[in-house]
Amino acid sequence: MTAAAPPAAAPAPADTIPGDGTYLVGTDIQPGTYKTAGPDNSAGDCYWQRSKDSSGSFDSIIANDNLAGQGVVTIRSSDGAFKSQGCQAWVKAG
């Protein structure tokens, strides 16, 4: 009988948010303060949203904004998800 290999550890949450998408806090991304250079030029504006969860419902939104230039957002450990659309990468600043 051969012993089974231990399960692989789940990857750590990322400290860079690559761009468009909805990311789960604590699973996909780390809480913290992130900076972006602004819109990726595909949409004209950079939209971000902090949410209670990933449901997409209006009631889930904690905070959001449309950026025409550079931006900073603090994602809290109590946030459920972070959405980014039309933005360059978000890089953790602290």
Describe each PLM feature range.
Residues 1-17:
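N-terminal low-complexity, Pro/Thr-rich disordered segments
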Residues 1-6, 40-94:
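Primarily secretory-pathway and cell-envelope proteins
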Residues 12, 16-22, 53-54:
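Extracellular beta-strand-rich, repetitive "passenger/adhesive" scaffolds
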Residues 19-21, 30-33, 78:
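A glycine-anchored, Pro-Gly-centered beta-turn/N-cap motif
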